[in-house]
Swiss-Prot record:
Membrane spanning residue stretches: none
Role noted for this protein: Located on the platform of the 30S subunit, it bridges several disparate RNA helices of the 16S rRNA. Forms part of the Shine-Dalgarno cleft in the 70S ribosome.
Annotated SUPFAM superfamilies: Translational machinery components
Keyword terms, alphabetized: Ribonucleoprotein, Ribosomal protein, RNA-binding, rRNA-binding
Cited InterPro entries: Ribosomal_uS11 (IPR001971), Ribosomal_uS11_bac-type (IPR019981), Ribosomal_uS11_CS (IPR018102), Ribosomal_uS11_sf (IPR036967)
Stated family: Belongs to the universal ribosomal protein uS11 family.
Name of the gene this protein is made from: rpsK
GO biological process terms held by the UniProt record: translation
Subunit architecture: Part of the 30S ribosomal subunit. Interacts with proteins S7 and S18. Binds to IF-3.
Organism: Bartonella quintana (strain Toulouse)
GO CC terms: ribonucleoprotein complex; ribosome
Protein name: Small ribosomal subunit protein uS11
């Protein structure tokens, strides 16, 4: 039986003026996701998706490139102003934020939503080099 040809779905342009940027910066990678007010993803990017591999994913420059790519995708949907939620202890927090500002977005608020335990799980052992 012949396979049915898969259609390529074209992304329709949504007119969304404001959104929320979630910057998840870990020790190994930086993920940037732009959502609307309800939490539906509009655009996303990461340092690994931009072609950085290994330890280069955790650099501030890789986070900047990922944020610029995500900003370009969001501007295609007509987005103008952003709220920023930063999560995680990684190196790409500030550089991703600066890249969004230089892309021409109006940043209305910046929130740090890094989860901090109230003496919850035992942390992993200290690294000895």
């Amino acid at each position: 039986m012949a396979k049915q040809a898969t259609r390529v779905r074209r992304r329709e342009r949504k007119n969304i003026l404001s959104g929320v940027v979630h910057i998840n910066s870990t020790f190994n990678n930086t993920m940037v996701t732009i959502t609307d007010a309800q939490g539906n993803a509009i655009a996303w990017s990461s340092a690994g998706a931009q072609g950085f591999k290994g330890s280069r994913k955790s650099t501030p420059f890789a986070a900047q490139v990922a944020a610029e790519d995500c900003a370009r995708k969001a501007q295609e949907h007509g987005m103008r102003s952003l709220e920023v939620e930063v999560c995680g202890p990684g190196a790409g927090r500030e550089s991703a934020l600066r890249a969004l500002q230089s892309a021409g977005f109006v940043i209305t608020s910046i929130r740090d939503v890094t989860p901090i335990p109230h003496n919850g799980c035992r942390p992993r052992k200290r690294r000895r080099v």
